[in-house]
Amino acid sequence: MSSNDVSPTSPRVLFVYYSHTKQAQRVCDAMAEVLRGRGCDVSQAQIEFTDPHYAKNFQTFPFRHAVFGILPLLWPQLRRKTGQIRIPDEAKAGNYDLICFGSPTWFFTTNMPLRSYLKSDEARTVLSGKPFAAYVVCRRYWSVNLKEVRKLGTAQGGRFVDGIRFTYEGGQIRSLLSLLSYFGKGEMRERSLGIKIPPTNLKPDFGDQAKEFANKLADSLAPAAQVGESASSPAGAA
């Protein structure tokens, strides 16, 4: 369904996310395609991290240094600090029927750019009285991230409806080596420090998982979103 096929009564859905490695963006794109196919008017808003204390390390990918590029964020993240961001116009105001947040995990919890948005006046304007969902993209740690998004969104007047996680392959040590290798090289490698490592980033079946969850969200907007093909089975909440 094209934007020309959207009617004035189509459900309006907003995605707000941060994505430096483009993994959260890939999930957003996959879900947005499904929701548009179900007759929704979908807006996608990517938060930009502009804080002068950290932004220089996030201007390019891969990082100049896989560890020291992100290490300055450890203490601020553990203290749940906010930072300067640029908010797209779509996420500043609008009468949306559903808002969905995409949140990569940074040091166990919600990344600073999305946290900063969720604590903003703009988020309160968008969320007040509205249902919202969230998806977490992470190596392993997802639950604290999802709980924080839920807590912050609810505090801004939103009503949490569902959440899901997209995790990477591998155990604790090997998945960390894979991610750091990708941060530093910008490409998948089979070994790091002489150790065989699994692929990092989203698993090959993430698209099916995203489609199922998006269809579940579309079903929650019924009957207005009963356009196109509905989900065959519900997605499990994270």
Task: Specify the residue positions occupied by each region the protein language model found.
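Short acidic, glycine/Ser/Thr-rich loop/turn "cap" segments at secondary-structure junctions
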Residues: 98-102, 130-136, 194-195
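Glycine-rich phosphate/pyrophosphate-binding loop and the adjoining helix
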Residues: 167-238
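Conserved donor sugar-nucleotide recognition element shared by glycan-biosynthetic enzymes
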Residues: 110, 142-145, 206
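Short, hinge-like loop/turn segments at secondary-structure boundaries
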Residues: 60-65, 151-152, 179-182
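N-terminal beta1-alpha1-beta2 submodule of the flavodoxin-like/Rossmannoid cofactor-binding fold
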Residues: 1-103, 108-112, 116-119, 123-128, ...
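Short, glycine-/small-residue-rich phosphate/pyrophosphate-handling segment
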Residues: 131-178
